[in-house]
Amino acid sequence: MSIVMQLQDVAESTRLGPLSGEVRAGEILHLVGPNGAGKSTLLARMAGMTSGKGSIQFAGQPLEAWSATKLALHRAYLSQQQTPPFAMPVWHYLTLHQHDKTRTELLNDVAGALALDDKLGRSTNQLSGGEWQRVRLAAVVLQITPQANPAGQLLLLDEPMNSLDVAQQSALDKILSALCQQGLAIVMSSHDLNHTLRHAHRAWLLKGGKMLASGRREEVLTPPNLAQAYGMNFRRLDIEGHRMLISTI
């Protein structure tokens, strides 16, 4: 798999790093670790929203060399918290994120996959927290999907499962898996270790802005590594063919 993004000694104040790593096309990479580990800070830096020490190469070019317009064509970023910028119909908000605004069937398909069919005519300021989260997710998918944007390469998601129920999480997993199979690189933060153990290809385990471990999910999410990160004991079980992590008291 080709390298989409290369990080070298990336650091930001006292909150992050220095850390190094790479993001590959066609993979799902999870950032895991306790609150305050630096996951959101790292994602914002990878998205080009902040600057600091170290270097980031995106598609072979320094990240800071990308214009905002060009960057929006090649990467999409979902921040952890955002309120509706102003009131508008959901369908209009989603259309604003499409590079090809004639692809109404694609908009309907993505909205349907996230159970937003009956929300398209509603105003963004009349949505519940979970509905708004799904609208935001649909927007970044429409922005970056190779189906309508051949230049799309990278999707960055900060705790995308927030406010989603089990069925909605499963729907999002299917969408992300399909994007990954189309060659997109996906980086997302998560607090659900078992979700990471099941769905991530690789993981970076962070604590206090430092990377404790990186590699394949099975190699990173080990009881010793997790005990170091969270200060508590874990066991890894095999249940009906699925690996599962549990904490022990």
From Swiss-Prot:
<keyword id="KW-1003">Cell membrane</keyword>
<dbReference type="InterPro" id="IPR017871">
    <property type="entry name" value="ABC_transporter-like_CS"/>
</dbReference>
<feature type="domain" description="ABC transporter">
    <location>
        <begin position="1"/>
        <end position="233"/>
    </location>
</feature>
<dbReference type="InterPro" id="IPR027417">
    <property type="entry name" value="P-loop_NTPase"/>
</dbReference>
<feature type="binding site">
    <location>
        <begin position="33"/>
        <end position="40"/>
    </location>
    <ligand>
        <name>ATP</name>
    </ligand>
</feature>
<dbReference type="InterPro" id="IPR003439">
    <property type="entry name" value="ABC_transporter-like_ATP-bd"/>
</dbReference>
<dbReference type="GO" id="GO:0015420">
    <property type="term" value="F:ABC-type vitamin B12 transporter activity"/>
</dbReference>
<dbReference type="InterPro" id="IPR003593">
    <property type="entry name" value="AAA+_ATPase"/>
</dbReference>
<comment type="subunit">
    <text>The complex is composed of two ATP-binding proteins (BtuD), two transmembrane proteins (BtuC) and a solute-binding protein (BtuF).</text>
</comment>
<keyword id="KW-0813">Transport</keyword>
<keyword id="KW-0067">ATP-binding</keyword>
<keyword id="KW-0997">Cell inner membrane</keyword>
<dbReference type="InterPro" id="IPR050153">
    <property type="entry name" value="Metal_Ion_Import_ABC"/>
</dbReference>
<dbReference type="Pfam" id="PF00005">
    <property type="entry name" value="ABC_tran"/>
</dbReference>
<keyword id="KW-0547">Nucleotide-binding</keyword>
<protein>
    <recommendedName>
        <fullName>Vitamin B12 import ATP-binding protein BtuD</fullName>
        <ecNumber>7.6.2.8</ecNumber>
    </recommendedName>
</protein>
<dbReference type="GO" id="GO:0005886">
    <property type="term" value="C:plasma membrane"/>
</dbReference>
<comment type="similarity">
    <text>Belongs to the ABC transporter superfamily. Vitamin B12 importer (TC 3.A.1.13.1) family.</text>
</comment>
<dbReference type="GO" id="GO:0016887">
    <property type="term" value="F:ATP hydrolysis activity"/>
</dbReference>
<keyword id="KW-0472">Membrane</keyword>
<dbReference type="InterPro" id="IPR023693">
    <property type="entry name" value="ABC_transptr_BtuD"/>
</dbReference>
<dbReference type="GO" id="GO:0005524">
    <property type="term" value="F:ATP binding"/>
</dbReference>
<comment type="function">
    <text>Part of the ABC transporter complex BtuCDF involved in vitamin B12 import. Responsible for energy coupling to the transport system.</text>
</comment>
<keyword id="KW-1278">Translocase</keyword>
